[in-house]
Amino acid sequence: MSSVSSQPQFRYTQPPSKVLHLRNLPWECTEEELIELGKPFGTVVNTKCNVGANRNQAFIEFEDLNQAIQMISYYASSSEPAQVRGKTVYLQYSNRQEIVNNKTTADVVGNVLLVTIEGDDARMVSIDVLHLVFSAFGFVHKITTFEKTAGYQALVQFTDAETATAAKLALDGRSIPRYLLAETVGQCSLKITYSAHTDLTVKFQSHRSRDYTNPYLPVAPSAIDSTGQVAVGVDGKKMEPESNVLLASIENMQYAVTLDVLHMVFAAFGEVQKIAMFDKNGGVQALIQYSDVQTAVVAKEALEGHCIYDGGFCKLHITYSRHTDLSIKVNNDRSRDYTMPNPPVPMPQQPVQNPYAGNPQQYHAAGGSHHQQQQQPQGGWVQPGGQGSMGMGGGGHNHYMAPPSSSSMHQGPGGHMPPQHYGGPGPMH
């Protein structure tokens, strides 16, 4: 039967040193706790914590050798082992006589942070999600991502060390907000230290690197990474080059989806600049343009596979478009430029024939809603009653419509999504 006294707490053959090596510490152990542990035996002049692969080792250096010997001797003869937060700590003399350069690269304050993303799905955290998280603390100049033996990592460059420090203090050890991650991605946490870099070199805009100070930097074709290989996700599928323009395909379109309906749905994630609707392959598609890529990324991850109406109707399938700026010359019921103060509006014309005569249940998206069309269902993002009941006004608003009844809050397959807000990063967990 093992006991605390039988554990290898001391290295008896190691010659005494004023530097002690501590093992089995809690991984989040702080420098203050190490000083408190050694204070009864003398003056601790230096520490080095979070050492080792598991970050559960540390070194403490006393002012003189006798103080270190006193601490080792005390715990060698005591029935109560050294403890930090209730966890037994094993002590031994270090083979070093002093802690040299306690301020390692990771401790020297700088404007560039080294971020390690931890979690089974760490590689699925996009560079735009990282930008959303860190830009809450100040302007992010550049981000590069890469893989090392330590895992999936990123370098995040801020304007100055003060901004970087604020981000590090707030985010180190925290989890990425759940709403920023795709449903298939598990929890991912951040471990942050300072980097020795002061200015990152970014040659191409890609899914692995981004320079937010140089909009004219060329985009890496087909999201090819530095190894010359097409980037793939953990499922083996080719990763899409991200874009500020989304291509939305609407499946099972039993009810009208107008331009204003699309604007209400997509504007919940940020300012929508332009929308263009068109028919293709017997279905309705739309291009939605945001002002930046990161907003489009969040909208895509949140809306992909969800339905505009309860019952699985008007299901959204979203991909990135190769377009970056839509050309919209006039505003009508199929296209709109929300950045134009007084856009030209064409005069309405009566259709030559009833486009719904052949199939009254089919929606052709050319003339808005029709009296022969099915009544919109209760619940979902859009309230029934056609365009007039959406509360859209002239330019719409950035909130989902509240569900008409509590019963519609239960999400079935592809059903109603409860209201959410997608601004900056939310509270960390």
Swiss-Prot record:
Presence of keyword Metal-binding: no
Key words, A-Z: Acetylation, mRNA processing, mRNA splicing, Nucleus, Repeat, RNA-binding
Residue segments, region Disordered: 331-429
Gene3D superfamilies per record: 3.30.70.330
Ranges of Low complexity composition bias in the record: 367-381
Keyword Flavoprotein: no
MF-aspect GO terms: mRNA binding; RNA binding
UniProt domain RRM: residue ranges: 18-96, 110-197, 243-323
Cellular component aspect of the GO annotation: cytoplasm; nucleus; P-body
Subcellular location: Nucleus
Predominant localisation class: nucleus
Function (record text): Plays a role in pre-mRNA splicing. Binds to the polypyrimidine tract of introns. May promote the binding of U2 snRNP to pre-mRNA.
Name of the protein: Polypyrimidine tract-binding protein homolog 2
Organism whose genome encodes this protein: Arabidopsis thaliana
Taxonomic classification: Eukaryota, Viridiplantae, Streptophyta, Embryophyta, Tracheophyta
